[in-house]
């Protein structure tokens, strides 16, 4: 029996704002517990929240980036539940009027493109964080309480673990380019919950879904879905029924593990938030947000190809992350050759980042230093071989122009300086001259090697070859 897989993804993205969604408390990652809180975050009676306009505009940007319709009149709702990290006993969210609806993202898997629909996206506040120690004590940190989130809910269009992975990559890329979030799973600014069900091929009725929670990387999302897909298939092939469960992915075993069985839909008793006014978004506000929108990856790729002469592949690689794309643009703005800059970013720079296991912003590399190095290669101040040493220097924060001069690595390109050396070497190697006359090309390589040896590798190979051939042909 063949089966069809249906996957839905709920992605929570922490918005990069200076203050929280309904209170003036700052938003900072890694501060001391409960350092960034106030009476609104603690849920004191009688205190009134106030909506952060920047959060609403970030939600509008996300909607635009994901081709969604912006809801013109919105209100907030209370989602009622009790948990220690939620002192108010409710979460403020958008149950009935999400900020964006009916969007889509294009993905590509194995050369095939597909649009994945986005059902809705809504802004809401995050909860605090519980921690437990071996002595039996539990602690609550409310620094995260009230941090603004946008939850993005996909339509059931994803049909394989690979498509889920591609969707998450595309979503992260587009949100990152808006600048509204760092979208870093390791810091908790992007979190993913997964729903998966299977049904016999040809059946219109969805199967019973399982939910996977607390997955901390895109790769583990893909692996968890692949395992869960096979687990559910085995159950159905054996004549059993899939139970509605919440499961987690175990990285050590590569399996999903039962957390709890869902007995029924939870009743959160939603009702409109009485302490917050509704929000009306008019055409002027939308236009203002559109004017603030940064250039999206697709437009950047097209510009790199049309204006800078890059290949489609180069443009695609450079726009995988906003960080790399911005670094490329800043380097080219310094006068560096676009193609050579792209080659270094995709080659040496990426290799360095992977080797050091760091992001670009965590290194000592700067667009100014990379541009100086690229320009020295272009104007033949240094050779490509010398550039390897220069690149290592700029990863350590060295200014390349002064470093090259201090190390005596400036390439010799002046014919007036090189010609006497070349003539002397040719005069001292009569056998090589004879070999050249007899059609032995290796003789040229030998003579070039002698010249490079005498100049300690600093002679410009192009100039050397030109003068050498002129000298050999004249004899």
Swiss-Prot record:
Q: Name one GO molecular function term.
A: glutaminyl-tRNA synthase (glutamine-hydrolyzing) activity
EC identifiers of the protein: 6.3.5.-
Coiled-coil residue spans = none
- Which terms under GO biological process does the entry name? glutaminyl-tRNAGln biosynthesis via transamidation; translation
What InterPro entries does its record include?
Asn/Gln-tRNA_amidoTrfase_suB/E (IPR017959), Asn/Gln-tRNA_Trfase_suB/E_cat (IPR006075), Asn/Gln_amidotransferase (IPR018027), Asn/Gln_tRNA_amidoTrase-B-like (IPR003789), GatB (IPR004413), GatB_C_1 (IPR042114), GatB_Yqey_C_2 (IPR023168), Gln-tRNA_amidoTrfase_suB_CS (IPR017958)
The source's superkingdom equals Bacteria
Similarity section: Belongs to the GatB/GatE family. GatB subfamily.
User: What PANTHER family does the record tag this protein with?
Assistant: GLUTAMYL-TRNA GLN AMIDOTRANSFERASE SUBUNIT B MITOCHONDRIAL AND PROKARYOTIC PET112-RELATED, GLUTAMYL-TRNA(GLN) AMIDOTRANSFERASE SUBUNIT B, MITOCHONDRIAL
> What's the protein here called?
Aspartyl/glutamyl-tRNA(Asn/Gln) amidotransferase subunit B
**Organism (species):** Pediococcus pentosaceus (strain ATCC 25745 / CCUG 21536 / LMG 10740 / 183-1w)
């Amino acid at each position: 029996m063949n089966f069809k897989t249906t996957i839905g993804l709920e992605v929570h993205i922490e918005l990069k704002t200076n203050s929280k969604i309904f209170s003036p408390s700052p938003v900072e990652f890694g501060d001391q517990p409960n350092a960034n809180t106030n009476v609104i975050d603690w849920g004191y009676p009688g205190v009134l929240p106030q909506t952060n306009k920047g959060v609403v505009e970030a939600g509008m940007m996300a909607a635009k980036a994901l081709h969604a319709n912006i809801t013109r009149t919105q209100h907030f709702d209370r989602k009622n539940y009790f948990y220690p990290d939620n002192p108010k006993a409710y979460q403020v969210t958008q149950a009935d009027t999400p900020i964006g609806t009916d969007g889509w993202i294009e993905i590509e898997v194995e050369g095939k493109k597909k649009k994945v629909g986005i059902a809705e996206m809504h802004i809401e506040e995050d909860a605090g964080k519980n921690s437990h120690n071996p002595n039996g004590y539990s602690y609550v940190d409310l620094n995260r309480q009230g941090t603004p989130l946008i939850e993005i809910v996909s339509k059931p269009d994803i049909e394989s673990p690979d498509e889920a992975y591609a969707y998450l990559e595309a979503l992260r890329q587009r949100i990152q380019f808006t600048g509204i979030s760092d979208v870093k799973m390791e810091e908790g600014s992007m979190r993913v919950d997964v729903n998966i069900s299977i049904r016999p091929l040809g059946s219109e009725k969805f199967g019973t879904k399982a939910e996977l929670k607390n997955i901390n990387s895109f790769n583990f999302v893909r692996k968890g879905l692949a395992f869960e897909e096979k687990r559910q298939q085995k159950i159905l092939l054996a004549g059993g029924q899939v139970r509605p469960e919440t499961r987690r992915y175990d990285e050590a075993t590569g399996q999903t593990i039962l957390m709890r069985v869902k007995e029924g839909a939870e009743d959160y008793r939603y009702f409109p938030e009485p302490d917050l006014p509704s929000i009306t978004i008019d055409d002027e506000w939308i236009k203002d947000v559109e004017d603030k929108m940064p250039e999206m990856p697709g437009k950047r790729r097209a510009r790199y190809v049309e204006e800078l002469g890059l290949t489609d592949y180069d443009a695609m690689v450079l726009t995988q992350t906003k960080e790399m794309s911005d670094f490329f643009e800043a380097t080219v703005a310094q006068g560096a050759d676009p193609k050579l800059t792209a080659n270094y970013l995709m080659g040496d720079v990426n290799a360095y980042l992977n080797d050091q296991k760091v992001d670009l912003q965590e290194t000592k590399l700067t667009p100014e230093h990379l541009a100086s190095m690229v320009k020295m290669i272009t104007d033949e101040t240094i050779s490509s071989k010398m550039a390897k040493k220069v690149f290592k220097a700029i990863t350590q924060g060295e200014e390349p122009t002064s470093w090259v001069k201090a190390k005596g690595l400036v390439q010799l390109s002046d014919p007036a300086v090189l010609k006497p050396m070349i003539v002397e070497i040719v005069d001292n190697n009569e056998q090589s001259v004879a070999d050249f006359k007899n059609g032995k090309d290796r003789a040229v390589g030998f003579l070039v090697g002698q010249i490079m040896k005498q100049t300690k590798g600093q002679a410009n190979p192009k100039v050397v070859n030109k003068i050498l051939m002129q000298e050999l042909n004249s004899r």
